[in-house]
């Protein structure tokens, strides 16, 4: 074998699938599987069998193409170690950097409000239905839970980072286990309700409107955009010097594809299992009660008459506990991102970017008071969580995940090779449909 053949063989071996690629695949997958998944079955199952089948067809393309577009934007910067803010500043100047900072902050902060409402409702339904205690004052419960989380975050952040990272996989395993364990309780209610003669494409409860609203919850639930920038930087530092940027882009796409397949498989199986166990009417009731599907399942099994199986008794208590842990995990992870983003905004606009004028401790205190205070107000007001996701959370995520990369592909010379592709049209349409939910909610 010649020397050149040996070099090619060595490079091929080194560039094949690595352990770090598997780690990142699981990391992206784990980032997306959080509390948002607990609301997807409610919205997906709300319209019955036909809409959720259409969502199943759309799920992987939405997850893969949208995140690949964001990854391509992150890859387009000249500095392999540059994050998305630096890349956007390189393409669009300082104004672009400010815009991306605002987008990141406002993409994450509403999620904290959503989780504040969710954890309050989940705790209250567990307190009243599973433990059998008298109802508590909502404002007190929300304040207690937020102060408890603030205390843990303030005094044990490093420990909680480790604990939360360990909880990702038990939570995913519990979702799969619950999905499998629900199979004996599946019924044909959702199939029996399918009447092809009375199906409507348009109208408030039509298939198109249901799928349109479902796209928003998919963008919200199938979202690992907060970690994409770090993921791309890691892969560029690992591959780009030896194998080039095109190879790195293909490797990132491959990892995103596998993570998306895992994510869609777990979430859609969980959604279908919940729908076949319950019914569209049950999903509508869960939406009205403003609780995650696990809490509704707990109440559903608690209300069962006759002899209960061990699983039914276990799920009656375990489902709400799993939901509480999942929400806390998601709240904590998003809190750190919100804190970092708000600190940057306060420093930039309150102290003109001069870090010597204010200590990190003071910045953290100012930001924590605003974050926890605003979250308490929203949790006390108790807006409908799915409406909040569709009107605020998902549209802001879509502007960052879908429309920003498409605008960059249109304007940035380094992304010119991606212009004129059908998947760009798909990503743009998904982004616009998600943002148009705001208009739909207003009217």
Swiss-Prot record:
Location(s), subcellular: Cell inner membrane
Membrane topology per record: Multi-pass membrane protein
Record keywords, A-Z: Amino-acid transport, Cell inner membrane, Cell membrane, Membrane, Symport, Transmembrane, Transmembrane helix, Transport
Domain of life: Bacteria
Summary of activators and inhibitors of this protein: Inhibited by the proton ionophore carbonyl cyanide m-chlorophenylhydrazone (CCCP). Partially inhibited by the respiratory chain inhibitor KCN. Activity is Na(+) independent.
Entry-linked Pfam families: Trp_Tyr_perm
Protein name: Threonine/serine transporter TdcC
Disulfide pattern: none
Stimuli inducing this protein: Induced in amino acid-rich medium under anaerobic conditions.
Catalytic activity: L-threonine(in) + H(+)(in) = L-threonine(out) + H(+)(out); L-serine(in) + H(+)(in) = L-serine(out) + H(+)(out)
GO CC term, one of those recorded: plasma membrane
Main location group: membrane
TM regions (residue ranges): 22-42, 44-64, 97-117, 140-160, 163-183, 207-227, 261-281, 311-331, 366-386, 389-409, 423-443
Similarity annotation: Belongs to the amino acid/polyamine transporter 2 family. SdaC/TdcC subfamily.
Function: Involved in the import of threonine and serine into the cell, with the concomitant import of a proton (symport system).
GO BP annotations listed: amino acid transport; L-serine transport; threonine transport
GO molecular function: L-serine transmembrane transporter activity; L-threonine transmembrane transporter activity; solute:proton symporter activity; threonine efflux transmembrane transporter activity; transmembrane transporter activity
């Amino acid at each position: 074998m010649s020397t050149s053949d040996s070099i090619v063989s060595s490079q091929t071996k080194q560039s094949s699938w690595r352990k770090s690629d598997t780690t990142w695949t699981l990391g992206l997958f784990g980032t997306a599987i959080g509390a948002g998944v607990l609301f997807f079955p409610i919205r997906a199952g709300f319209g019955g069998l036909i809409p959720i089948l259409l969502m199943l067809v759309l799920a992987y393309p939405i997850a893969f193409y949208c995140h690949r577009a964001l990854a391509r934007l992150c890859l387009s910067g000249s500095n392999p170690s540059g994050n998305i803010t630096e890349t956007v500043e390189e393409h669009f100047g300082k104004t672009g950097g400010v815009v991306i900072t605002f987008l990141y902050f406002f993409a994450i902060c509403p999620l904290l409000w959503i989780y504040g409402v969710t954890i309050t409702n989940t705790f209250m339904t567990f307190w009243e239905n599973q433990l059998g205690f008298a109802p508590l004052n909502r404002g007190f419960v929300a304040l207690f839970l937020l102060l408890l989380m603030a205390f843990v975050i303030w005094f044990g952040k490093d420990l909680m980072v480790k604990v939360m990272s360990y909880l990702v996989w038990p939570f995913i395993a519990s979702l799969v286990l619950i999905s499998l364990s629900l199979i004996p309780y599946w019924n044909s209610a959702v199939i029996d309700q399918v009447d092809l003669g009375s199906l409507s494409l348009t109208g408030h409860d039509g298939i198109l409107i249901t799928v349109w609203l479902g796209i928003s919850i998919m963008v919200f639930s199938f979202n690992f955009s907060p970690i994409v920038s770090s993921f791309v930087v890691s892969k560029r530092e690992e591959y780009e010097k030896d194998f080039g940027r095109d190879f790195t882009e293909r490797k990132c796409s491959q990892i995103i594809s596998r993570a998306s397949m895992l994510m869609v498989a777990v979430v859609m199986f969980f959604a279908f299992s919940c729908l076949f166990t319950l019914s569209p009417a049950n999903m509508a009731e869960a939406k009205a009660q403003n609780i995650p599907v696990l809490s509704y399942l707990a109440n559903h099994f608690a209300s069962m008459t006759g002899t209960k199986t061990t699983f039914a008794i276990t799920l009656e208590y375990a489902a709400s506990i799993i939901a509480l842990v999942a929400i806390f995990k998601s709240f904590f992870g998003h809190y750190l991102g919100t804190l970092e983003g708000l600190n940057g905004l306060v420093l930039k606009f309150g102290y003109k970017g001069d870090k010597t004028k204010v200590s990190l401790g003071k910045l953290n205190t100012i930001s924590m008071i605003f974050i926890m205070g605003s979250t308490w107000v929203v949790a006390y007001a108790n807006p409908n969580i799915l409406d909040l996701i569709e009107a605020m959370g998902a549209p802001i995520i879509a502007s960052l995940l879908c429309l920003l990369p498409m605008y960059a592909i249109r304007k940035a010379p380094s992304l010119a090779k991606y212009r004129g592709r059908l998947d760009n049209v798909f990503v743009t349409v998904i982004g616009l449909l998600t943002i148009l939910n705001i208009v739909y909610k207003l009217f």
